[in-house]
Amino acid sequence: MSMMKIGFYYINELLSRIDCTQLLKGNPGISGTAYMFGLISTQLAERDNGIEVTYFAPHAVNGSPKMHVEKVNDVVEAYRKAEATGLDYLVVKNNDANLLLEKLPPPAQSQTRIVVWCHNFLNQKELNCYSRCPLVARIINVGREQMDVYRDHAAFRKSDYIYNTVQIDQRYTDGLTPVAEREDVVTYMGCVIPSKGLHVLAEAWPEVLRKKPNAQLYVIGTGALYGGNVTLGKWGLAEPRYERYIMKYLSRDGQLLPGVHLMGIMGNEKYDILTQTKVGVPNPTGNTETFCVSAVEMQMLGIRIASKRCAGYLDTVRNGVLVRNERQLADEIVRQLDADVSPDDSPTYFAQHFAPETIIGEWERLFLKTIGKDVHLHPVLPLSNPDFEYKTLKERLRRLKLRFPWLDGLLPTVNIFVDLNWKVHSFLGKLKRRLTGDQF
């Protein structure tokens, strides 16, 4: 039986500094996307599954000895090498797929097809491109709710989802202190950039302190979490203008407020803080969240979540409350701190549902059982969370377009109007900050 040949392409210089064979022990302090590319490619190569893996990158990758590593300058060179060596599929992140499809004229015939791994939400241009391009074999989302955002677009027919995998070393998950017995510790974990929302938690923090004066806030991460040449402010937290806005709420007279701790980028030592945390606040804007590894890690350690209702959290938040408005965040954090919570099965549920064995198995099924037969891993019905972002209407449009395919080019998708509403809301927020001198 011939081997299935799969390639991965993703640029992140941090992958050259870590041992990808140790990623099963947890994220060592790199971005979630880099962590997933390193972990999935390495584990697919390690297993006896009939899959041969090649990793394309402009830098070294310390992966499995069974994984081939090819040095390339960009995604176009990666695709050309993949095609020349007879790979069946090349897995790329959506922004790299965009660059590839813009620069590389689709060949008349090609053995190597593209699997677009979407760690971000897609715009209409991307959806149109992927749905029409014969080179794109599958659009893999990292969550069911992320995929459902485009339910009424033609690209949905090429779409499927495989959740990210999350693993925490057993020494941190064994013998957890019950959350009700923990002190009033709140933790934010993620990159400190505007789209990840630390400023929303910072704005809420004075109100939290008014009601819970002894509460503590830990911030794990900086604006340099994703790598690159990033200039941080004097606190080493974020880009200077954004940092100044955040610290307006978290400092006084040039000193951190009592109980505020800026921890910087952390590896597995972050779990020493998380195991003592009562309430976790991953990205409280919900913007950009297609899955949120941080939210899952927190819940695996018994932490209650307080954040905003969004697509990614509908898939991954089981132990906590998702508010509909950012102004409700402070009150919800206080409620979660005061909650008399009985132990539940959330840590066990998450450890099983997002276990590497489960998720790697999904990737193997994708390549070995479904993609070549043009079938999907998951059924499109029944609807989950039908009240979220007009999903019931999207489903009606999907069925209508299946019946009358010529409507694809005539009827706009519902998400065009959802995005427009978000852009107006975002513009008004920026305008308000500019008028009040709080622009970042």
Model-derived features with residue positions:
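A charged, aromatic-enriched C-terminal amphipathic alpha-helix characteristic of glycosyltransferases
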Residues: 32-35, 271, 338-415
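Acidic donor-binding loop of glycosyltransferase active sites
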Residues: 274-290
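Short hydrophobic beta-strand element within catalytic cores of glycosyltransferases
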Residues: 300-307
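Conserved donor-binding/catalytic core segment of Leloir-type glycosyltransferases
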Residues: 5-9, 140, 170, 177-209, ...
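Nucleotide-activated donor-binding/catalytic signature segment of Leloir-type glycosyltransferases, i.e.
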Residues: 230-265
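A short, active-site helix/loop in glycosyltransferases that binds the activated sugar's phosphate group
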Residues: 125-130, 134-161, 166-171
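Short acidic alpha-helix that forms the nucleotide-activated donor recognition element
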Residues: 79-85, 247-252, 267-277, 300
